[in-house]
């Protein structure tokens, strides 16, 4: 095996060594967080499922299709609820007010038209939980997105 000549080390060799060490440190950091926070993350996942299931329907739903997803160390819930008919803006507004009585706070409401389709959205928060509800005109469904903004979320994982 050839020894490294540290006095005549080329620039790209040095960059490669530094990048390799940085990647190793990052992998050790994420791996340690993964191992240490496992129980906390599983508990958070279960809390999010329970919180999503406690969100009532604005009108009677036919189908509730949701899933728990993971991005690195963060879990989030996304779901679609299908209704018997199209949900109106007034019903979505009433639904937001109904969630206010359950401790949720409305952060933002907005309506936009994209490709001649109108969509209405409500962003809510309750403690560390954040939820977005979207509905489109002409469709008999709403999409829900729920995430917990805790210290792991703040770290960017």
What are these regions (language model features)?
Residues 2-157:
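An acidic-aromatic pocket/loop used at catalytic or ligand-binding sites
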């Amino acid at each position: 095996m050839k020894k490294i000549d540290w006095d005549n080390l080329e620039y790209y060799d040095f960059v490669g060594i530094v990048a390799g060490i940085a990647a190793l440190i990052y992998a050790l950091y994420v791996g340690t967080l993964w191992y240490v926070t496992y129980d906390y993350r599983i508990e958070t996942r279960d809390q999010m499922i329970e919180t999503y299931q406690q969100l009532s329907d604005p009108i009677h739903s036919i189908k509730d299709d949701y899933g728990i997803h993971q991005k690195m160390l963060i879990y989030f819930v996304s779901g679609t609820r299908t209704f018997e008919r199209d949900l109106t803006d007034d019903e979505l507004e009433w639904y937001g007010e109904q969630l206010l009585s359950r401790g949720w706070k409305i952060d933002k409401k907005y309506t936009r038209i994209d490709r001649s389709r109108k969509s209405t959205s409500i962003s809510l928060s309750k403690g560390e939980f954040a939820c977005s509800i979207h509905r489109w005109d002409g469709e008999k469904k709403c999409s829900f997105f729920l995430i917990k903004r805790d210290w792991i979320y703040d770290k960017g994982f």
